[in-house]
Amino acid sequence: METTVKRTPSSLPKTRLVVLLIAALMAGPQLAQAQEREDLEKLRATVLSLINTLVKNGVMSRNQADAMMRDAQRAAETKLAAAPPPDVGADGKKIVRVPYVPEAVRTQMREQITAEVLASTRGAGGAGGWGGTESAGVAEAGSRLKISGDIRLRGEAIQQGSGNTPALAYSEGQRDLTRAADVWADPNANTREDLDRTRVRARLGFQFAVTEQVTAGLTLSTGGVTGPTSTNQTMASGSNQTPGYFNKYALTVDKAFVALEPLRGLRLSGGRFANPFMGTDLVWADDLNFEGFAASYKMPLDSQWSGFASAGWFPLSFKAPGQSSQRSLTAIQGGVDWQFGTRPNALKMAVALYDYSGIEGIKETTLDKSLVRDYVVRSEYGSGYRQRGNTLFRINSDMAGDTATNWGLASGFSELDLTAALDLALDGPFHLVLTGDVVTNLDFGSSKIKRRTGGLSVSDGSDLGYLVKAQFGMPVIAQASDWNVSVGYRRLGSDAVLDAFTSSDFGRGGTNNKGFTLAGNYGIWKNTWLSARWMSSDLVDSMVPTLGGVARPTKFSVDTLQLDLNARF
């Protein structure tokens, strides 16, 4: 007569649970039929994998794991020795009787065993745990650390119009004004020949929950320190545009921040962190991160409506006595989010004011230069961060013999930005997302430019920019066969926004451009997808500003094709 005693894993002392389990698994294959043997092998593989993971993560040492396995082996041998001899059938073969365990019960046992082992390792240590308080602390710290990242491989073809204005014409007869300082300074600059390049972008982020209210973050990325908008690394390139010959890449700190959440919905951030404002790449480039201090607040208004607001102060440069004044950005944004309908439809709208302080160019004088020791120009808009498009004027003194050329911004910048996004959930997983963005520079004006530049009458340029975009498909590419396509049009006036922070891809970067964008994404595996984007741009105004009613037209058209392979983890 056989007696079956039911015993669940939870009824065993935690200090003996794994040892007895492994012992049973070691003895099991010798007592089981084919199907039961397969199930036991699966369970044994699960437990052994769990033990190896605990060793790898420092929760228990390899010596402890080996000792556990030896104890389990001895227990298995003891169990087999104590077992009664099996019955023998008429054919002389041993008869094995195995009680039936339903699949649902076996699955529950596996899950419960895993939970019990993990629970025991999260304890405070002591006799009932492994590794004591130090290992428990490691396990706890690991549970509060989040690691994420992505890698993008890009092939890019840039086709510049054969009828584009040559670089030499950008500076002929125009000494004091420009909208393309890099081309103005180099009469041999390329404005007509096509460019092909391959690029890689890699980002690795760490986010640690210090407490429930405090988060610290750090992100490393490829890319240089000479521009804020891009984290791309061009292959086969060395320093100062020399050939790379397998030269290694440099990593930069792209984010380093501490975020506080003292109240529900309120987030205070300091350091270098992700863009806290709703917007598009018409104003802020996709890869741009902010540095400074910001506060964001989200508040539900009712079951469908919620409000949000963000504000921040961001230093651009600090005051250097006798050399330069402080420059900064002060920003505020407020908006609403409406969830409507029986499907997950949403309408999100926001209005923002981005006000720059101290960035306008100041015309230098002979007196300035003669009274200040080791004098340098104080309001230059430098080549390390500017792109193209903003109206610039020569800020150097007009004194005889001063042949240097340094450029300053002819306009101030106080940008009023209105952004809206309508997300319509259609049949199945498909969404139609319509996006609009309109921005105007409240500090732009020909009279202001004339006073600032010392009498230069600029009669062209624009303070207005807008973007419209429609996207159809899955909102996010996460699984294989996910896809979306989009089409957009933009027109960004020369001085609608500061050209340093807008898109670095459209029209080769900067402002004073208009045109179309077509794009598509397709998932090939989980968190792995292909992207294609085509951009076609032309100028809005001449790159040589119209001075005193004398126009100097320029042409600069660019078609850009980008093909990407993306992997996210």
Language-model regions, residue ranges each:
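Surface-exposed loop and membrane-interface regions of Gram-negative outer-membrane beta-barrel proteins
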Residues: 155-201, 206-264, 277-285, 403, ...
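Residues on the lipid-exposed face of transmembrane beta-strands in outer-membrane beta-barrel proteins
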Residues: 149, 202-208, 256-260, 293-297, ...
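Residues that define the transmembrane beta-barrel architecture of outer-membrane proteins
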Residues: 143, 196-200, 249-254, 287-291, ...
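N-terminal periplasmic/intermembrane-space "pro-region" immediately following the signal or transit peptide
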Residues: 2-7, 21-188, 569
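Outer-membrane beta-barrel pore domains
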Residues: 2, 6, 37-38, 190-191, ...
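Transmembrane beta-strands of outer-membrane beta-barrel pores
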Residues: 153-159, 220-226, 274-276, 299, ...
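Repeated loop/turn-to-beta-strand initiation elements of outer-membrane beta-barrel proteins
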Residues: 212-216, 264-268, 302-309, 341-349, ...
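Surface-exposed coil loops of outer-membrane beta-barrel proteins
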Residues: 227-343, 348, 352, 357-407, ...
